[in-house]
Amino acid sequence: MEFAKIGNSQMGLLVSGAVLFTVVPLIIAIVWTVKKKEKFTSILVGAACFILFALILEKPLQNILVFPTLMGLGDHAAAGFINARPVLWALILGLFPGVFEETGRLVAFKTVLRNRKNRETGISYGIGHGGIEVILTMGITYITYIAYAAMINSGTFGNMIAQVAAQAPEQEANGYALAAQLAAFSAGDMVIGVAERIFAVMFHTGASILVFYACRDKKKFWLYPLAILLHTVMDSVAGLQMAGVIALSPVMLEVVVAVFGSAVFFGGYFLLYKKDAGKEQV
């Protein structure tokens, strides 16, 4: 099959996106640490915990349960049961990041960051967690898209799709959809992606504030399961969209992310962080 060529305007947007999603998170991290005189290691811990709990632990286990063929495994009864039930499928896709990522925060604040009681620690962790997610999920994705676009223009993309289809037949259609998406990529698509990441980082920062105070004050430990619940619900909405249970426009889906991200961030910021001014232990 011959794919539509990727134009110069699309390539320019992809390159701009790759730079934006890799450089800006680093700038935010540096500005925050300098302005607040925070230890950069708190940000690094947030980034490291995202890599450990989300990428190394969560994703492989989720794939083994729901998408075994992506792991080179044979299909199994549990995967068939889950994939035949869209609502359950969406719930599991939301529950895994909710449990693993919020538990990652808990472990970090209870161990390597246990002696850092200043209120900025929660935000520093969130910047690290959210920032590395932007770099790895968007920055690297845009770099990959640039490579795919070059393959499409050189006529070698079809060979890659054939190789993917041989190992995971259900992913073949995604390859064709991606090629069409790249050919039609617009500035509006990038704006939506930027907005989604902004609100996602706000969510991660707010959730980090919640779990930080859950660890610092035993009476507020309920904030930890609350963070899991909020994370699960937000990601499950995206899962319901992917499963076809609901049909939201891209803009409406971003509105959902915006509502969750804003509510969690501003709730944590004003109800916990701001009220703690001058009270934190040094």
Label every model-predicted segment.
Residues 1-282:
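Hydrophobic alpha-helical segments at protein termini of multi-pass membrane proteins
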